[in-house]
Amino acid sequence: IEDLIADESVVITISHAGYIKRTSLSEYKTQNRGGVGQKSAGTRDQDFLEHLFVATNHQYLMYFTQKGKCYWMRVYEIPEGTKTSKGRAIQNLINIESDDKVKAFICTQDLKDQDYINSHYVIMATKQGQVKKTPLEQYSRPRQNGINAITIKEDDELIEAKLTTGNSQVLLAVKSGKLVRFEEEKTRPMGRTASGVRGITLADEKDEVIGMVSIDKNDVTES
């Protein structure tokens, strides 16, 4: 079926409530700087857009859940919609447990490309401050029911996952207002069943990690 689908560029939008769709990039006309913009998605009451990717139909979208599972979908399998449509609920597209929730998304190139999967990693962070780096190669064989991406300890959950080249700086931010920055290369690669290592020490029981970003070191300029 892949050979019958044009590998065109598309815009993937995902709402806070978990509605997803893809729309041809050609539907979005170029505007001058300072333009009013174009509507990219319709949303239900009290919902809003949270994620946006530009990809091609033959790429993969990886879903990571709060319980630490990973699911895959070819981009062309994402329901197609117009700029104003609301999309489909992710829960109806993948075999996710009813008490689990997708927390992070990664868009990747061809998972059959050995050079690509051997030169990239997935780095994850949990609410309680654990971080883990795993070679992308360990996620290169999609399964319909998903796989375990990280072992989540009791009272913890996955909050973010990022694709890296192994040459990034990682920043973790916590609710108490603190932030830690470290070199990705100092985090050794681990298997999918590992629970990771301590990335940041929380201030108290009420503190938690609220976000993680990764920046390629080639894009960092020190002042």
PLM region spans:
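Short, structured "edge-of-domain" segments at secondary-structure transitions
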Residues: 1-223
